[in-house]
Amino acid sequence: MKKRILAWGAASLLLASSLAACGPKATTETEKKAESGKASEAASEKAEGAFEDEALKADLKLYTYPIGKWGDSASVDSLLQNFNAKYPDIHVTVEYLDYQSGDDQVNTAIEGNAAPDLIMEGPERLVANWGAKGLMVDLADLFEDDAAKDIYPNVVEACKSSEGKYYEYPLAMIAHCMAINKTAFENADALQYLDLDNHTWTTENFFKAVKALHDKGQENVVAVYCGGQGGDQGTRALVNNLYGGKFTNKEHTEYAVDSSENAQALEELVKAEGINFDPALVGGDEITLFRNGTLAMSLCWNSAQQNNKDNGEAGKTNNGDEIIPMLFPAKDGKAELCGGIWGFGIFDNGDENKVKAAKAFIRFMANDAEQAKLSVQTTGFFPVHKDLTDVYEGTENAETMKLFTEKFMPSFGDYYQVTPGWATARTEWWNMLQRIGQGGDVKTELTTFQTNANAAAKA
């Protein structure tokens, strides 16, 4: 059995716009007056609609998962102040969820006919879970707004169900990655295995680095954390990228984990000294151990973690070692990163007035030119609007965000989290890793995962 690490605490893309141009034509005075009248009428209707929108009155409840500072009440209060300056009669109360018990809280509220009006998370929950159950409002009209025309097509597709209904309106996106402790790598002469210009490495060099670090005395180099679903995008990306395995088919209709590529990856991880499967850890715990020097690498990283200053200087461990973000190792050095998309959904609580107010909230937070920048900044991630540029210009995080934009976001991979049965598949994944870490046969456990996950996908 692989040795268990003691956890010290938890911490927790593209399109071109088409423009149609019409040549000028001669018009009569009558035509001009008619056109002018239509324009005035349209402007009047638009102004009236805007007035009615801003005059909405409603009490809304928003549930939000800890998406960057959207999990911080002071930060969200500031955003709500901006919203209430325009919509003084829409009152939004917020309940802050975590990734350990958040799903249970939402499901309990649904069962008690007390679902929130608004919820902020990703398509795997809003589209593939609650949307697929018919609990969410179709937001197709929001995507018909001019303000939605520059959202990356792959993001739009991720927000749409297999029936063609849109259950999420996106705000921000990220490509998750891993990170290494530069000092630990220097001491073990392991920097030679990294392409630091591109932040990439090969599978072969990854295992060479692990060996070098372990031989130098780093007992715990990498933790394959499997105590729950928190941060599981890291373990999925590691296993899939090592030898080119997949998690689902391209159509997102079934799971495809049971493959020779994934089996080889897991077998090599089990064998490697310094890589430990730990059923006591989830992603947040692993980050804590990486920051305090217990681990030399983290599988649960992104730009928000790189910018985090909770325990000291951004981009440094607790004792000041430099943290270098890296793509996951791949056989050819070309990894596909698991992506995250976050936005808003509306539960169908049968109150049309609340739905209108909730849509006004979404439009303001995600589409308003100035507010959207602040909303995205609060996530610590990247805008889904192609034309929403310079979000971090002039901020202390500008350099880091530029690095991630150039080196990591182009590797945003397939967004397979919308595959049916996703909630079950996530649970099956960490349970499978636990059994493998405890000595279970890799091939047998992969087959068990795929059987159970695909049964859920077809249910």
Where are these predicted regions, by residue range?
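Extracytoplasmic/periplasmic substrate-recognition and gating elements
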Residues: 85, 91, 267, 271-275, ...
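Extracytoplasmic/periplasmic solute-binding protein
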Residues: 163-171, 176, 202-254, 295
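Conserved N-terminal structural module of periplasmic/extracytoplasmic solute-binding proteins
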Residues: 4-9, 16, 22-128, 147-148, ...
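Long, aromatic- and glycine/proline-rich binding clefts that accommodate carbohydrate-like moieties
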Residues: 323-327, 376-431, 435
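Glycine-centered hinge/linker elements that transmit conformational signals in sensory
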Residues: 207-212, 251-283
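Extracytoplasmic "Venus flytrap"/periplasmic binding protein-like
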Residues: 82, 86-151, 165, 187-189, ...
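Short, solvent-exposed loop/beta-turn-alpha elements that line the ligand-binding surface or hinge
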Residues: 53, 138-151, 195-199, 222-225, ...
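Hinge/lid segment of periplasmic solute-binding proteins
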Residues: 43-54, 122-177, 320-329, 393-396, ...
